[in-house]
Amino acid sequence: MVEDTASVAALYRSYLMPLGIDINIVGTGRDAIDSLKHRIPDLILLDLRLPDMTGMDVLHAVKASHPDVPIIFMTAHGSIDTAVEAMRHGSQDFLIKPCEADRLRVTVNNAIRKASKLKNDADSAGSQNYQGFIGSSQKMQQVYRTIDSAASSKASIFITGESGTGKEVCAEAIHAASRRGDKPFIAINCAAIPKDLIESELFGHVKGAFTGAATDRQGAAELADGGTLFLDELCEMDLDLQTKLLRFIQTGTFQKVGSSKMKSVDVRFVCATNRDPWKEVQEGRFREDLYYRLYVIPLHLPPLRERGEDVIEIAYSLLGYMSHEEGKNFVRFSQPVIDRFNEYEWPGNVRQLQNVLRNVVVLNNGKEITMEMLPPPLNQPFERKESVQPDLSELISVRDICPLWLTEKLAIEQAIKACDGNIPRAAGYLDVSPSTIYRKLQAWNEKEEKQKA
């Protein structure tokens, strides 16, 4: 944020705190330009009038060296023409000062999300990526097909999946692919907000509604008008609020906390949970009528351990991005690391893989990620699950004896199927090297081709 008035900068920082973003404030144009030598921001909020140069001067300097960095101008009423001119030279948007909290939050939130999507698309060039996802496994292809089919509808979508599988990325993909893609995408985490505040976060409040409500405030429902409202960890919502949410879904209207007036909005509902929603209904923690209202199009995200060779594809994409961001030179993984990544169960899913790679890239140097660089438990001996021993006690006739090569072929095919096509992982369970399996598969394919000829 480039703002020379300290009180205004502090106020705007407080407005943006709920977004959970890191905000760096500088007071001059020169400081703003110099700061780019140390860190490239995801967004620049730029005051048009600065003590040492104009905002236009800063705009030209930033765009000359970092053309992809989005800039939003903050301007008083009298300089709107200049702000419009700035947009012609690369500014993404402008805000009129004094700026309301909700307007600032929505503008900044949308700008950062758009910039993040463009960055992800660029970083994933050449990879099998889809709307922020990376991976081409069969299970993810099914996810992509569901998103393509359901995005244009207004029907509610219920995303399920373990923590770290990318449920918010999925919700953003649905929004981006829908007719509402240019409208707000507002996310609210029902598990992260205290019970006594979540109604205000969802529906907003009026001045004096409760202690500390000094001004009127828009809630997520109103901010999402025309766009998508994403309710993350919905099964954590209190039953009383579930009743009000059901009424909102049925009528499209709601009341702010402390108000008797009804407000009407048009939103598309996408929700997510890491639990089994029907089990939550059966155990009385989730309303059955709300379940039927929202569970119109179910979409399940597979855990990373079931996504086959997507693991390495994602790892390489993250490695390239993180190495660039941290100023490192990593370009590849050693074969033992690749084998370990394929063998590992990844209980924390993609989020855990991100954290592992961030740890490795920040704390180490070089071009190749090796086993010694991995944090626990990945750098520890891999404990294989004990295999089930076949029962050889029963006598069989000679007619039941299967050729050894066919027994081997069936065992390998079953292992590959059980590991969702992940050959390195299947090799780990079979206690052979991946190259052995690749070689045998190739030999069997060649044999079949000769028989056909």
From Swiss-Prot:
Residues 1-112 form the Response regulatory domain. Residues 133-362 form the Sigma-54 factor interaction domain. ATP binds at residues 161-168, 224-233. GO terms for molecular function: ATP binding; ATP hydrolysis activity; sequence-specific DNA binding. Keywords: ATP-binding, DNA-binding, Nucleotide-binding, Phosphoprotein, Repressor, Transcription, Transcription regulation, Two-component regulatory system. One of its GO terms (biological process) is regulation of DNA-templated transcription. InterPro entries: AAA+_ATPase, CheY-like_superfamily, Homeodomain-like_sf, HTH_Fis, P-loop_NTPase, QS_regulatory_LuxO, Sig_transdc_resp-reg_receiver, Sigma_54_int. Involved in the regulation of different processes depending on the cell density. Acts together with sigma-54 to repress, perhaps indirectly, some genes. This is Regulatory protein LuxO. It comes from Vibrio vulnificus (strain YJ016).
